[in-house]
Amino acid sequence: SDAVADGVHAISGVVDS
């Protein structure tokens, strides 16, 4: 997972695997 996706998911409350 890239930094941008991780940031968005963190804000959304979703953790990408």
Curated annotation (Swiss-Prot):
Keyword vocabulary terms for this entry: Secreted
- Which family does the UniProt entry place this protein in? Belongs to the Frog skin active peptide (FSAP) family. Septenin subfamily.
Protein's name in the database? Septenin 1c
| Principal location | secreted
Q: Which organism is it from?
A: Osteopilus septentrionalis (Cuban treefrog)
Q: Which domain of life is it from?
A: Eukaryota
Record bears the keyword Acetylation: no
**A cellular-component GO term for this protein:** extracellular region
Tissue expression, as annotated, is: Expressed in skin glands.
Q: Give the subcellular location.
A: Secreted
Task performed by this protein: May act as an antimicrobial peptide.
